[in-house]
Protein backbone atom coordinates (compact mmCIF):
# COMPACT_ATOMS: atom_id res chain seq x y z
CA UNK A 1 0.00 0.00 0.00
CA UNK A 2 2.82 2.35 0.84
CA UNK A 3 4.32 1.96 -2.61
CA UNK A 4 1.00 2.79 -4.24
CA UNK A 5 0.65 5.92 -2.15
CA UNK A 6 4.24 7.00 -2.78
CA UNK A 7 3.68 6.56 -6.50
CA UNK A 8 0.66 8.84 -6.37
CA UNK A 9 2.49 11.41 -4.27
CA UNK A 10 5.56 11.30 -6.50
CA UNK A 11 3.50 11.96 -9.60
CA UNK A 12 1.74 14.83 -7.86
CA UNK A 13 5.08 16.27 -6.73
CA UNK A 14 6.57 16.05 -10.23
CA UNK A 15 3.56 17.74 -11.79
CA UNK A 16 3.61 20.43 -9.11
CA UNK A 17 7.32 21.08 -9.62
CA UNK A 18 7.56 20.93 -13.41
CA UNK A 19 4.00 21.55 -14.56
CA UNK A 20 1.67 19.29 -16.50
CA UNK A 21 3.14 20.07 -19.93
CA UNK A 22 6.72 19.27 -18.94
CA UNK A 23 5.66 16.11 -17.12
CA UNK A 24 3.73 14.89 -20.17
CA UNK A 25 6.65 15.82 -22.44
CA UNK A 26 9.00 13.71 -20.31
CA UNK A 27 6.64 10.76 -20.55
CA UNK A 28 6.24 11.22 -24.30
CA UNK A 29 9.98 11.17 -24.98
CA UNK A 30 10.61 7.94 -23.09
CA UNK A 31 11.44 4.99 -25.28
CA UNK A 32 8.78 2.29 -25.68
CA UNK A 33 9.42 -1.43 -25.30
CA UNK A 34 6.82 -4.00 -26.30
CA UNK A 35 7.51 -7.38 -24.74
CA UNK A 36 5.64 -10.58 -24.09
CA UNK A 37 5.72 -13.18 -21.37
CA UNK A 38 5.29 -16.80 -22.34
CA UNK A 39 6.10 -20.29 -21.17
CA UNK A 40 4.46 -23.49 -19.95
CA UNK A 41 1.21 -23.36 -18.02
CA UNK A 42 1.60 -22.53 -14.32
CA UNK A 43 5.14 -21.20 -14.75
CA UNK A 44 3.90 -18.01 -13.07
CA UNK A 45 3.54 -15.55 -15.96
CA UNK A 46 0.63 -13.58 -14.55
CA UNK A 47 2.15 -13.59 -11.05
CA UNK A 48 5.41 -12.24 -12.46
CA UNK A 49 3.66 -9.35 -14.20
CA UNK A 50 1.66 -8.61 -11.07
CA UNK A 51 4.88 -8.59 -9.03
CA UNK A 52 6.58 -6.35 -11.59
CA UNK A 53 3.72 -3.83 -11.42
CA UNK A 54 3.45 -4.03 -7.64
CA UNK A 55 7.14 -3.68 -6.80
CA UNK A 56 7.69 -0.90 -9.34
CA UNK A 57 4.91 1.11 -7.65
CA UNK A 58 2.44 0.94 -10.52
CA UNK A 59 -0.60 -0.14 -8.49
CA UNK A 60 -2.83 2.43 -6.81
CA UNK A 61 -4.95 2.30 -3.69
CA UNK A 62 -8.25 1.52 -5.40
CA UNK A 63 -6.62 -1.26 -7.43
CA UNK A 64 -5.05 -2.78 -4.32
CA UNK A 65 -8.34 -2.66 -2.46
CA UNK A 66 -10.10 -4.42 -5.31
CA UNK A 67 -7.25 -6.92 -5.58
CA UNK A 68 -7.48 -7.77 -1.89
CA UNK A 69 -11.21 -8.42 -2.19
CA UNK A 70 -10.75 -10.58 -5.28
CA UNK A 71 -7.91 -12.52 -3.64
CA UNK A 72 -10.05 -13.27 -0.59
CA UNK A 73 -12.91 -14.33 -2.84
CA UNK A 74 -10.73 -16.67 -4.94
CA UNK A 75 -8.81 -18.05 -1.96
CA UNK A 76 -5.89 -19.24 -4.08
CA UNK A 77 -3.12 -17.72 -1.96
CA UNK A 78 -4.51 -17.84 1.56
CA UNK A 79 -4.37 -14.43 3.22
CA UNK A 80 -1.76 -13.07 0.79
CA UNK A 81 -2.61 -10.97 -2.25
CA UNK A 82 -2.88 -13.00 -5.47
CA UNK A 83 -0.95 -10.75 -7.86
CA UNK A 84 -1.91 -12.91 -10.85
CA UNK A 85 -5.45 -11.52 -10.64
CA UNK A 86 -4.12 -8.17 -11.85
CA UNK A 87 -3.63 -9.72 -15.27
CA UNK A 88 -6.04 -12.67 -15.48
CA UNK A 89 -9.04 -10.57 -16.44
CA UNK A 90 -11.38 -13.14 -17.96
CA UNK A 91 -13.74 -14.90 -15.57
CA UNK A 92 -12.82 -18.27 -17.08
CA UNK A 93 -9.14 -17.56 -16.46
CA UNK A 94 -9.67 -16.64 -12.83
CA UNK A 95 -11.74 -19.74 -12.14
CA UNK A 96 -9.23 -22.09 -13.80
CA UNK A 97 -6.11 -20.23 -12.68
CA UNK A 98 -4.74 -20.06 -16.21
CA UNK A 99 -4.33 -17.41 -18.90
CA UNK A 100 -6.50 -17.86 -22.03
CA UNK A 101 -6.54 -14.54 -23.85
CA UNK A 102 -3.59 -12.26 -24.55
CA UNK A 103 -3.72 -9.75 -21.68
CA UNK A 104 -2.09 -6.37 -22.33
CA UNK A 105 -0.80 -4.14 -19.56
CA UNK A 106 0.90 -0.74 -19.67
CA UNK A 107 3.38 0.77 -17.24
CA UNK A 108 6.48 2.93 -17.16
CA UNK A 109 9.69 3.24 -15.19
CA UNK A 110 12.06 6.17 -14.94
CA UNK A 111 13.78 5.05 -18.15
CA UNK A 112 11.15 3.44 -20.39
CA UNK A 113 7.51 2.89 -21.16
CA UNK A 114 6.34 -0.71 -21.49
CA UNK A 115 3.52 -2.64 -23.12
CA UNK A 116 3.30 -6.18 -21.76
CA UNK A 117 1.53 -9.00 -23.57
CA UNK A 118 0.80 -11.85 -21.17
CA UNK A 119 0.32 -14.82 -23.50
CA UNK A 120 -1.29 -18.22 -22.83
CA UNK A 121 0.72 -21.25 -21.78
CA UNK A 122 -1.72 -23.96 -22.84
CA UNK A 123 -0.99 -25.60 -26.18
CA UNK A 124 -4.51 -25.01 -27.50
CA UNK A 125 -3.95 -21.24 -27.11
CA UNK A 126 -0.61 -21.12 -28.93
CA UNK A 127 -2.33 -19.12 -31.70
CA UNK A 128 -3.00 -16.38 -29.11
CA UNK A 129 0.69 -16.39 -28.24
CA UNK A 130 1.62 -15.95 -31.90
CA UNK A 131 -0.72 -12.95 -32.07
CA UNK A 132 0.96 -11.36 -29.06
CA UNK A 133 4.46 -12.04 -30.40
CA UNK A 134 3.83 -10.43 -33.77
CA UNK A 135 4.15 -6.88 -32.41
CA UNK A 136 6.77 -7.41 -29.70
CA UNK A 137 10.51 -6.73 -29.72
CA UNK A 138 11.48 -8.87 -26.73
CA UNK A 139 10.25 -12.11 -25.19
CA UNK A 140 10.38 -13.02 -21.52
CA UNK A 141 10.37 -16.83 -21.51
CA UNK A 142 9.41 -18.24 -18.13
CA UNK A 143 10.81 -21.58 -17.02
CA UNK A 144 9.74 -23.39 -13.86
CA UNK A 145 12.99 -24.23 -12.07
CA UNK A 146 11.51 -27.55 -10.90
CA UNK A 147 10.81 -28.86 -14.40
CA UNK A 148 13.30 -27.09 -16.64
CA UNK A 149 12.78 -26.52 -20.37
CA UNK A 150 9.42 -28.06 -21.34
CA UNK A 151 7.75 -28.77 -24.68
CA UNK A 152 5.64 -25.61 -24.53
CA UNK A 153 8.72 -23.57 -23.61
CA UNK A 154 10.39 -24.80 -26.80
CA UNK A 155 7.27 -24.10 -28.84
CA UNK A 156 7.05 -20.53 -27.59
CA UNK A 157 10.75 -19.85 -28.09
CA UNK A 158 10.54 -21.14 -31.65
CA UNK A 159 7.39 -19.16 -32.50
CA UNK A 160 8.83 -15.98 -30.99
CA UNK A 161 11.96 -16.43 -33.10
CA UNK A 162 9.87 -17.25 -36.18
CA UNK A 163 7.91 -14.01 -35.67
CA UNK A 164 11.08 -11.93 -35.70
CA UNK A 165 11.92 -11.55 -32.00
CA UNK A 166 15.69 -11.54 -31.49
CA UNK A 167 15.91 -10.51 -27.82
CA UNK A 168 15.09 -13.01 -25.07
CA UNK A 169 15.10 -12.87 -21.28
CA UNK A 170 14.81 -16.38 -19.83
CA UNK A 171 13.28 -15.92 -16.37
CA UNK A 172 13.94 -19.05 -14.32
CA UNK A 173 11.08 -18.81 -11.83
CA UNK A 174 10.30 -20.52 -8.52
CA UNK A 175 13.98 -20.73 -7.61
CA UNK A 176 12.90 -20.34 -3.97
CA UNK A 177 11.42 -23.85 -4.06
CA UNK A 178 14.88 -25.25 -4.86
CA UNK A 179 16.85 -23.15 -2.44
CA UNK A 180 18.17 -20.85 -5.21
CA UNK A 181 20.48 -23.65 -6.37
CA UNK A 182 23.08 -22.31 -8.82
CA UNK A 183 23.48 -25.73 -10.46
CA UNK A 184 19.78 -25.80 -11.36
CA UNK A 185 20.13 -22.35 -12.93
CA UNK A 186 23.19 -23.41 -14.95
CA UNK A 187 21.54 -26.62 -16.16
CA UNK A 188 18.45 -24.79 -17.45
CA UNK A 189 20.61 -22.11 -19.05
CA UNK A 190 22.63 -24.76 -20.90
CA UNK A 191 19.51 -26.69 -22.00
CA UNK A 192 17.81 -23.58 -23.40
CA UNK A 193 20.97 -22.34 -25.13
CA UNK A 194 21.43 -25.74 -26.77
CA UNK A 195 17.84 -25.76 -28.05
CA UNK A 196 17.99 -22.33 -29.71
CA UNK A 197 21.32 -22.85 -31.46
CA UNK A 198 19.61 -23.14 -34.84
CA UNK A 199 17.54 -19.96 -34.46
CA UNK A 200 20.18 -17.61 -35.81
CA UNK A 201 21.76 -14.74 -33.93
CA UNK A 202 19.89 -14.11 -30.68
CA UNK A 203 20.49 -11.83 -27.70
CA UNK A 204 19.70 -13.99 -24.63
CA UNK A 205 19.82 -13.09 -20.94
CA UNK A 206 19.09 -15.44 -18.02
CA UNK A 207 17.84 -14.35 -14.59
CA UNK A 208 16.99 -16.49 -11.53
CA UNK A 209 13.94 -15.21 -9.68
CA UNK A 210 10.90 -15.83 -7.54
CA UNK A 211 7.83 -14.01 -8.83
CA UNK A 212 5.88 -14.92 -5.70
CA UNK A 213 8.40 -13.37 -3.31
CA UNK A 214 9.90 -10.72 -5.61
CA UNK A 215 13.50 -11.98 -5.75
CA UNK A 216 15.36 -10.38 -8.71
CA UNK A 217 12.17 -8.98 -10.23
CA UNK A 218 12.61 -5.31 -9.31
CA UNK A 219 15.00 -5.53 -6.38
CA UNK A 220 18.17 -7.70 -6.26
CA UNK A 221 17.85 -10.87 -4.21
CA UNK A 222 20.00 -11.65 -1.19
CA UNK A 223 19.53 -15.35 -1.96
CA UNK A 224 21.54 -15.30 -5.22
CA UNK A 225 25.00 -13.92 -4.39
CA UNK A 226 26.36 -16.09 -7.23
CA UNK A 227 24.28 -14.17 -9.82
CA UNK A 228 26.00 -11.03 -11.10
CA UNK A 229 23.43 -9.93 -13.70
CA UNK A 230 20.66 -7.36 -13.43
CA UNK A 231 17.13 -7.78 -12.14
CA UNK A 232 14.33 -8.39 -14.60
CA UNK A 233 13.33 -4.70 -14.58
CA UNK A 234 16.95 -3.59 -15.09
CA UNK A 235 17.23 -5.88 -18.12
CA UNK A 236 13.97 -4.58 -19.57
CA UNK A 237 15.18 -1.00 -19.10
CA UNK A 238 18.61 -1.48 -20.66
CA UNK A 239 18.39 -4.10 -23.43
CA UNK A 240 18.71 -2.33 -26.78
CA UNK A 241 15.91 -3.60 -29.00
CA UNK A 242 16.08 -0.91 -31.66
CA UNK A 243 15.85 -2.48 -35.09
CA UNK A 244 17.41 0.53 -36.80
CA UNK A 245 14.27 0.75 -38.91
CA UNK A 246 15.43 4.01 -40.43
CA UNK A 247 18.43 2.22 -41.94
CA UNK A 248 16.18 -0.23 -43.80
CA UNK A 249 14.68 0.41 -47.26
CA UNK A 250 11.85 2.95 -47.25
CA UNK A 251 8.36 1.41 -47.16
CA UNK A 252 5.23 3.58 -47.01
CA UNK A 253 1.99 1.55 -47.16
CA UNK A 254 -0.90 3.79 -48.20
CA UNK A 255 -3.67 3.57 -45.63
CA UNK A 256 -6.08 5.89 -47.42
CA UNK A 257 -6.23 8.68 -49.97
CA UNK A 258 -6.91 12.08 -48.36
CA UNK A 259 -8.98 14.40 -50.57
CA UNK A 260 -10.50 17.14 -48.35
CA UNK A 261 -10.98 19.44 -51.36
CA UNK A 262 -10.27 19.61 -55.10
CA UNK A 263 -6.90 21.29 -54.52
CA UNK A 264 -5.39 18.63 -52.25
CA UNK A 265 -4.69 14.94 -52.82
CA UNK A 266 -2.44 13.18 -50.34
CA UNK A 267 -1.64 9.64 -49.30
CA UNK A 268 -1.91 8.94 -45.59
CA UNK A 269 -0.11 6.19 -43.73
CA UNK A 270 2.70 5.27 -41.36
CA UNK A 271 6.24 4.83 -42.66
CA UNK A 272 7.11 1.22 -41.85
CA UNK A 273 10.85 1.58 -42.40
CA UNK A 274 13.52 3.81 -43.89
CA UNK A 275 13.46 7.57 -44.51
CA UNK A 276 11.62 9.58 -47.17
CA UNK A 277 12.49 13.23 -47.86
CA UNK A 278 10.83 16.04 -49.77
CA UNK A 279 12.15 15.91 -53.34
CA UNK A 280 12.84 12.15 -53.27
CA UNK A 281 11.77 10.23 -56.32
CA UNK A 282 9.39 7.45 -55.31
CA UNK A 283 7.78 4.55 -57.12
CA UNK A 284 4.19 3.47 -56.49
CA UNK A 285 3.77 -0.28 -56.42
CA UNK A 286 2.47 -2.51 -57.85
CA UNK A 287 1.77 -0.11 -60.76
CA UNK A 288 5.43 0.97 -61.07
CA UNK A 289 4.55 4.62 -61.75
CA UNK A 290 7.02 7.25 -60.50
CA UNK A 291 6.85 10.76 -59.13
CA UNK A 292 8.59 13.06 -56.63
CA UNK A 293 7.59 13.87 -53.07
CA UNK A 294 6.15 17.39 -53.01
CA UNK A 295 5.14 17.73 -49.35
CA UNK A 296 5.15 15.72 -46.13
CA UNK A 297 2.12 16.94 -44.19
CA UNK A 298 1.31 16.53 -40.50
CA UNK A 299 -1.16 18.15 -38.12
CA UNK A 300 1.66 20.28 -36.69
CA UNK A 301 2.90 21.43 -40.10
CA UNK A 302 5.05 20.20 -42.98
CA UNK A 303 8.21 18.16 -42.40
CA UNK A 304 11.39 18.01 -44.51
CA UNK A 305 11.54 14.23 -44.04
CA UNK A 306 9.67 11.36 -42.43
CA UNK A 307 11.33 8.56 -40.46
CA UNK A 308 10.15 5.07 -39.58
CA UNK A 309 7.16 5.01 -37.24
CA UNK A 310 5.80 8.46 -38.11
CA UNK A 311 2.25 8.85 -39.40
CA UNK A 312 2.06 11.48 -42.16
CA UNK A 313 0.34 12.42 -45.39
CA UNK A 314 2.55 12.54 -48.49
CA UNK A 315 1.70 14.56 -51.60
CA UNK A 316 3.34 13.99 -54.99
CA UNK A 317 4.20 16.34 -57.84
CA UNK A 318 2.29 14.23 -60.37
CA UNK A 319 -1.28 12.96 -60.40
CA UNK A 320 -0.73 9.20 -60.52
CA UNK A 321 -3.22 6.48 -59.68
CA UNK A 322 -2.61 5.34 -56.10
CA UNK A 323 -5.14 3.74 -53.77
CA UNK A 324 -5.34 2.04 -50.37
CA UNK A 325 -3.07 -0.98 -50.23
CA UNK A 326 -0.48 0.43 -52.65
CA UNK A 327 3.04 1.12 -51.43
CA UNK A 328 5.51 3.96 -51.96
CA UNK A 329 9.22 3.14 -52.03
CA UNK A 330 12.50 4.53 -53.34
CA UNK A 331 13.25 3.16 -56.83
CA UNK A 332 16.76 1.92 -56.01
CA UNK A 333 15.54 -0.21 -53.10
CA UNK A 334 12.05 -1.22 -54.15
CA UNK A 335 10.36 -4.32 -52.71
CA UNK A 336 9.37 -7.34 -54.76
CA UNK A 337 6.11 -7.81 -56.63
CA UNK A 338 4.79 -11.35 -56.97
CA UNK A 339 1.70 -13.52 -57.20
CA UNK A 340 3.33 -16.66 -55.77
CA UNK A 341 5.12 -16.68 -52.42
CA UNK A 342 6.92 -19.15 -50.21
CA UNK A 343 6.32 -18.51 -46.52
CA UNK A 344 6.38 -19.89 -43.00
CA UNK A 345 2.86 -20.36 -41.68
CA UNK A 346 1.35 -20.78 -38.20
CA UNK A 347 -2.11 -22.34 -38.50
CA UNK A 348 -4.57 -20.85 -36.00
CA UNK A 349 -7.90 -22.45 -36.84
CA UNK A 350 -9.51 -25.60 -35.46
CA UNK A 351 -10.59 -26.47 -38.98
CA UNK A 352 -7.55 -27.91 -40.81
CA UNK A 353 -5.94 -26.11 -43.72
CA UNK A 354 -7.38 -27.20 -47.06
CA UNK A 355 -5.05 -27.10 -50.04
CA UNK A 356 -6.54 -25.08 -52.88
CA UNK A 357 -9.19 -23.36 -50.74
CA UNK A 358 -9.43 -19.64 -51.40
CA UNK A 359 -8.73 -17.36 -48.42
CA UNK A 360 -8.54 -13.60 -48.04
CA UNK A 361 -4.99 -12.42 -47.41
CA UNK A 362 -3.96 -9.06 -45.92
CA UNK A 363 -0.57 -7.37 -45.95
CA UNK A 364 0.22 -3.72 -45.17
CA UNK A 365 -3.32 -2.52 -45.90
CA UNK A 366 -3.68 -4.59 -49.07
CA UNK A 367 -6.39 -7.25 -49.20
CA UNK A 368 -6.68 -9.86 -51.92
CA UNK A 369 -7.24 -13.61 -52.23
CA UNK A 370 -4.83 -16.53 -52.02
CA UNK A 371 -4.76 -20.29 -51.69
CA UNK A 372 -2.15 -22.63 -50.26
CA UNK A 373 -1.15 -24.85 -53.16
CA UNK A 374 1.58 -26.90 -51.50
CA UNK A 375 2.98 -27.78 -48.09
CA UNK A 376 6.73 -27.98 -48.50
CA UNK A 377 7.40 -29.35 -45.01
CA UNK A 378 6.04 -29.37 -41.46
CA UNK A 379 8.17 -28.36 -38.47
CA UNK A 380 8.24 -30.36 -35.24
CA UNK A 381 8.69 -27.61 -32.66
CA UNK A 382 10.02 -30.04 -30.08
CA UNK A 383 13.00 -31.16 -32.16
CA UNK A 384 12.89 -28.61 -35.04
CA UNK A 385 12.90 -31.63 -37.36
CA UNK A 386 11.22 -31.18 -40.74
CA UNK A 387 8.77 -33.76 -42.04
CA UNK A 388 7.26 -33.99 -45.50
CA UNK A 389 3.73 -32.97 -46.40
CA UNK A 390 2.86 -36.67 -46.42
CA UNK A 391 2.92 -36.56 -42.60
CA UNK A 392 -0.31 -34.51 -42.61
CA UNK A 393 -1.85 -36.05 -45.71
CA UNK A 394 -5.52 -36.83 -45.18
CA UNK A 395 -5.76 -34.89 -41.91
CA UNK A 396 -4.53 -31.54 -43.20
CA UNK A 397 -2.51 -28.95 -41.32
CA UNK A 398 -4.09 -28.74 -37.86
CA UNK A 399 -4.39 -26.13 -35.11
CA UNK A 400 -1.03 -24.72 -33.93
CA UNK A 401 0.89 -26.48 -36.71
CA UNK A 402 3.87 -24.70 -38.28
CA UNK A 403 4.89 -25.32 -41.88
CA UNK A 404 6.70 -23.95 -44.92
CA UNK A 405 4.09 -23.50 -47.67
CA UNK A 406 3.58 -22.14 -51.17
CA UNK A 407 0.74 -19.67 -51.75
CA UNK A 408 -0.72 -18.50 -55.04
CA UNK A 409 -2.48 -15.14 -55.13
CA UNK A 410 -5.20 -13.92 -57.45
CA UNK A 411 -3.25 -10.71 -58.12
CA UNK A 412 0.20 -9.24 -57.58
CA UNK A 413 1.17 -8.04 -54.12
CA UNK A 414 4.10 -5.96 -52.93
CA UNK A 415 6.22 -7.57 -50.23
CA UNK A 416 9.60 -7.99 -48.54
CA UNK A 417 11.03 -10.97 -46.76
CA UNK A 418 9.69 -10.95 -43.21
CA UNK A 419 13.24 -11.05 -41.88
CA UNK A 420 13.88 -7.69 -43.59
CA UNK A 421 10.72 -5.65 -42.92
CA UNK A 422 7.99 -7.00 -40.65
CA UNK A 423 5.21 -4.74 -41.91
CA UNK A 424 5.57 -5.75 -45.56
CA UNK A 425 6.60 -9.35 -44.93
CA UNK A 426 3.93 -10.36 -42.44
CA UNK A 427 0.48 -11.40 -43.65
CA UNK A 428 -2.66 -13.02 -42.29
CA UNK A 429 -5.03 -15.48 -43.93
CA UNK A 430 -8.75 -14.95 -43.32
CA UNK A 431 -11.56 -17.45 -43.83
CA UNK A 432 -13.90 -15.86 -46.35
CA UNK A 433 -17.01 -17.41 -44.83
CA UNK A 434 -16.47 -16.88 -41.09
CA UNK A 435 -14.10 -13.88 -41.36
CA UNK A 436 -11.86 -15.58 -38.78
CA UNK A 437 -8.09 -15.18 -38.95
CA UNK A 438 -6.84 -18.69 -39.68
CA UNK A 439 -3.08 -18.25 -40.14
CA UNK A 440 -0.11 -15.99 -39.60
CA UNK A 441 2.17 -15.87 -42.64
CA UNK A 442 5.84 -14.82 -42.69
CA UNK A 443 7.14 -14.41 -46.24
CA UNK A 444 10.47 -15.98 -47.20
CA UNK A 445 10.53 -15.32 -50.96
CA UNK A 446 8.30 -14.88 -53.99
CA UNK A 447 8.07 -14.75 -57.74
CA UNK A 448 5.73 -13.68 -60.50
CA UNK A 449 4.19 -16.62 -62.33
CA UNK A 450 2.39 -16.19 -65.63
CA UNK A 451 -1.09 -17.65 -65.45
CA UNK A 452 -2.07 -17.28 -69.07
CA UNK A 453 -3.39 -20.66 -70.21
CA UNK A 454 -5.73 -21.75 -72.94
CA UNK A 455 -9.28 -21.97 -71.65
CA UNK A 456 -12.53 -23.31 -73.09
CA UNK A 457 -14.38 -20.50 -71.32
CA UNK A 458 -15.05 -17.02 -72.62
CA UNK A 459 -13.74 -13.88 -70.94
CA UNK A 460 -17.28 -13.15 -69.72
CA UNK A 461 -17.60 -16.60 -68.15
CA UNK A 462 -14.24 -16.27 -66.41
CA UNK A 463 -15.09 -12.81 -65.07
CA UNK A 464 -18.55 -13.90 -63.94
CA UNK A 465 -17.08 -16.93 -62.17
CA UNK A 466 -14.55 -14.72 -60.37
CA UNK A 467 -17.37 -12.37 -59.33
CA UNK A 468 -19.42 -15.24 -57.89
CA UNK A 469 -16.43 -16.64 -55.96
CA UNK A 470 -15.63 -13.22 -54.52
CA UNK A 471 -19.10 -12.15 -53.37
CA UNK A 472 -20.72 -15.55 -52.69
CA UNK A 473 -17.95 -17.68 -51.13
CA UNK A 474 -20.53 -19.83 -49.30
CA UNK A 475 -21.58 -21.23 -52.69
CA UNK A 476 -18.12 -22.87 -52.86
CA UNK A 477 -17.93 -22.31 -56.62
CA UNK A 478 -14.82 -23.80 -58.20
CA UNK A 479 -12.32 -21.65 -60.07
CA UNK A 480 -13.05 -22.51 -63.70
CA UNK A 481 -9.90 -20.70 -64.86
CA UNK A 482 -7.91 -23.64 -63.50
CA UNK A 483 -9.85 -26.23 -65.45
CA UNK A 484 -8.13 -27.65 -68.49
CA UNK A 485 -9.36 -27.47 -72.04
From Swiss-Prot:
EC number: 2.7.7.4
Binding residues annotated for GTP, in chain numbering: 39-46, 118-122, 173-176
An annotated GO BP: sulfur compound metabolic process
UniProt catalytic activity: sulfate + ATP + H(+) = adenosine 5'-phosphosulfate + diphosphate
Entry function: With CysD forms the ATP sulfurylase (ATPS) that catalyzes the adenylation of sulfate producing adenosine 5'-phosphosulfate (APS) and diphosphate, the first enzymatic step in sulfur assimilation pathway. APS synthesis involves the formation of a high-energy phosphoric-sulfuric acid anhydride bond driven by GTP hydrolysis by CysN coupled to ATP hydrolysis by CysD.
Oligomeric and partner information: Heterodimer composed of CysD, the smaller subunit, and CysN.
Nucleotidyltransferase listed as a keyword: yes
This protein's pathway: Sulfur metabolism; hydrogen sulfide biosynthesis; sulfite from sulfate: step 1/3
Region described as G5: spans on this chain: 210-212
Family (UniProt): Belongs to the TRAFAC class translation factor GTPase superfamily. Classic translation factor GTPase family. CysN/NodQ subfamily.
NCBIfam families referenced in this protein's UniProt entry, alphabetically: CysN (TIGR02034), PRK05124.1 (NF003478)
Residue ranges of domain tr-type G in the record: 30-243
Region (G3): 118-121
Region span, G2: 97-101
Gene3D superfamilies reported in the protein's UniProt record: P-loop containing nucleotide triphosphate hydrolases (3.40.50.300), Translation factors (2.40.30.10)
Residue stretches spanning the membrane: none
One annotated GO molecular function: GTP binding
G1: region residues: 39-46
Coiled coil: none
Gene: cysN
Key words, A-Z: ATP-binding, GTP-binding, Nucleotide-binding, Nucleotidyltransferase, Transferase
Protein name, entry field: Sulfate adenylyltransferase subunit 1
HAMAP family for this protein: Sulf_adenylyltr_sub1
Region feature G4, mapped onto this chain: 173-176
Amino acid sequence: MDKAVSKTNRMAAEISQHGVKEYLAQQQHKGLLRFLTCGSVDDGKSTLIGRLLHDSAQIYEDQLASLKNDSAKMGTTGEAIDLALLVDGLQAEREQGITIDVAYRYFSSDKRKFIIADTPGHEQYTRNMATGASTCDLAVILVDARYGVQTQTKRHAFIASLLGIRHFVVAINKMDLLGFDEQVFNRIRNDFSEFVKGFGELDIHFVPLSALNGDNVVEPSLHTPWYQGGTLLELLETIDTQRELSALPARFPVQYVSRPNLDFRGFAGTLASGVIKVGDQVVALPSGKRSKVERIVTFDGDLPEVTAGQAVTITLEDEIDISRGDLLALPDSAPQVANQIIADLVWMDEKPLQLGQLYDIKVAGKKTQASVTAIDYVVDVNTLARSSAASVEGEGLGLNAIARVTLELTEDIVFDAYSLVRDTGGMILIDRLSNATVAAVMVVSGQHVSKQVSSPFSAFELEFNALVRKHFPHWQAIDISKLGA
